[in-house]
Amino acid sequence: MQKVSVITMTYNDLSHLEKCAGQVLKQDYENLEYIIVDGGSTDGTKEFLAQLREQYGEKVTYVSEPDGGLYDALNKGIRMATGDIVGLMCDEFADKGVVSRMVSVIEKEGTDGVHGNINYVSGEKVVRRWRMGKGSIRTGWMPGHPTLYLKKEVYETYGLYKTDYKIAADYEFMIRILKDKKVSLSYMDEVLVHMFHGEESASTGGFGNYLKSLKEGHRALTENHVTFAWTVDFCRIMRVLLQFIKR
């Protein structure tokens, strides 16, 4: 049975962490390692992490110390990971069988990773549905990062997240691994993640963050030598608008 490492990054957001950790530790996949990277919180997070470690033993690994931000924390978690398959979770899995189904699909299809759909939620209400589908980065398509679970060897081959990006290092990383079409992904046409919307989560942001993301995204395209970068930018914007229309 392949080992799966699930990584959560957190900083002074205990209530959110409690929800997230509860969902991860309810997963029915047995060979699961849960890694929590805390940026040195002062809100009781360290005490909560110690309780998780005491309750779940070696299944839970954590570190609590200052870091260089979201992507530095994610890189730290990847380095700590001992699993064959690695992914992040800073929100909630859709149900307790998500990880089991992910592993099953990767093994059945012989791919390097898997991704699926996302629902953005506020409380009990779904405010946006994001069906990722299949596509090409040249048409503005990109896997939903919170649903992306990859074999660790992909990170070993292509490197980690670039910390000089502040908001779009995930986009740059996905361009880097997908542009030459050597990394194969399976698509699961189902909701894998419920993503907290607005103030409930650091995973979503406002229009200002979206503009910053577009700027850094264009930089990522040019640095990775993707031709017609402005066309890709336009396609990305249109895909986002269509998601809002369909919600």
Summary of predicted features, one role per range:
Residues 1-206:
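Nucleotide-sugar donor-binding/catalytic module of glycosyltransferases
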Residues 54, 222, 246-247:
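Generic surface-pattern signal
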Residues 191, 195, 204-231:
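Catalytic core of nucleotide-sugar-dependent glycosyltransferases
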Residues 97, 209-211, 246-247:
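Short, intrinsically disordered/low-complexity patches at protein termini
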Residues 224-245:
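A transmembrane-helix-recognition feature enriched in membrane-embedded lipid enzymes
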